[in-house]
Amino acid sequence: TIFFSYADLGFISSGLKYAAEYYIRGDRKNEIRTIGFTAFIMLSMFMLIALLFGIISIFPQILMPELEPDSENFYTARYLLILLSVSCPVIIGQRILNMIYSIRVEDYKLQRISAVGSILKILSVFFFFGSENYLLVPYFAFVQFINLSVVLMAAFQVRKYQYSFVEFLKAIRFDRIIFDKE
């Protein structure tokens, strides 16, 4: 997921700064507009990366030339790349929720939910990996499921901030005014 770490091109930091200013002023409309624009940039960049991973999952030898077609490692690489590609929206959700909670200086609430998810991931290692088990792909799928669950729980909690999900979805678009500002 290091590819996703820098894919926002600095727009998350900038968007966080401006959205926080709007939050402090009580300007909910422009706060959501700024977060929506930032989500649009993330969506654009992350979907390109997800598409790249999707293509590489068809031909994993592009990334790892030593893989033998139809081998167990070939299929493991393929499934892991597919799961990584499909989990892109979850990563975007994590980043957006992190912005919303950070703006309010309440990211500790998101961290609590994430901590429960992390504990479940750690405990699941004993199930997926053991003396007779080495279930890497199912483990990675489980981790992504936990990440999705954390995003859904945190998104549910965002309702306490009177965030309109529909209004936010409408704000996910390119906005020239915000682009020039950021």
Region spans (language model):
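Small-residue-rich midsections of specific transmembrane alpha-helices
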Residues: T1-Y23, M42-I49, C88-Q94, V150-M153
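Hydrophobic/aromatic residues within transmembrane alpha-helices of membrane transport systems
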Residues: G15, A19-Y22, E31, T38, ...
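Interfacial transmembrane-helix starts/ends
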Residues: K29-S44, A77, D180
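Short membrane-interface helical motifs at transmembrane helix boundaries
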Residues: A50-S71
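Alpha-helical transmembrane segments of multi-pass membrane proteins
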Residues: E68-Q94, Q111, A115, L123, ...
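Helix-loop interface residues and adjacent transmembrane-helix termini in multi-pass membrane transporters
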Residues: F74, I103-R104, S131-Y134
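Membrane-interface helix-loop junctions in multi-pass transport and translocation proteins
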Residues: Y108, I119-L152
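Interhelical loop/hinge segments that connect adjacent transmembrane helices in multipass membrane
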Residues: L136-F140, A154-E182
